[in-house]
């Protein structure tokens, strides 16, 4: 990893706490790869915090601006396929130009990787668990903005489409959703 990527990894590891490790994930034909940091025992027993640490090298265009991002999440350590799903989302941004921004949903991401069928989609939000990762200046390049994955149900996705991002965000906050609980009931 070059210095910029190391700085991104160190920043995420410091925010997460716990024991850190980095693994590389490739797409099916090994033409693209993303490095993913996993930190265990930092947030709570039985949970692992994840962050991509090399996605910021890929363009992410929002309203004509290139907003560099990393994707983060918290999930039960026992959900072994969760890291793969997060890496798949990052590879979709890198390879296929998917937009990663607050309010955007990656449909079916968790179901496709066999993580959960109850909450198959990922809603991207500002990093509520780690506010210090909102916007981070790192050496030799543009600022990096972290987004946090919130697993959502199909009915929550439809509610978001009908009522808007702020309505679903408010609903999730009011009901104090444990966003790391991959078997939680839907709020809608």
PLM segments and residue spans:
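Acidic, proline/glycine-rich low-complexity IDRs
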Residues: 1-68, 72-188
């Amino acid at each position: 990893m070059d210095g910029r990527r190391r700085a991104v990894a160190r920043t995420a590891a410091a925010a997460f706490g716990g024991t850190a490790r980095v693994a590389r994930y490739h797409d099916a034909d090994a033409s693209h790869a993303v490095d993913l940091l996993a930190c265990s025992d930092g947030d709570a027993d039985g949970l692992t915090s994840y962050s991509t640490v090399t996605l910021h090298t890929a363009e992410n265009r929002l309203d004509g601006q290139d907003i560099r991002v990393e994707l983060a999440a918290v999930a039960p350590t026992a959900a072994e396929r969760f890291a793969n799903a997060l890496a798949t989302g990052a590879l979709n941004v890198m390879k296929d130009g998917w937009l990663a921004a607050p309010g955007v949903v990656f449909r079916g991401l968790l179901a496709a990787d066999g993580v959960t069928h109850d909450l198959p989609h990922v809603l991207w939000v500002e990093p509520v668990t780690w506010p210090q990762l909102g916007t981070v200046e790192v050496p030799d390049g543009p600022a990096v903005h972290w987004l946090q994955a919130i697993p959502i149900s199909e009915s929550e996705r439809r509610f978001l489409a009908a009522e808007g991002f702020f309505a679903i965000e408010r609903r999730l906050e009011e009901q104090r959703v444990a966003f790391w609980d991959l078997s939680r009931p839907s709020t809608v």
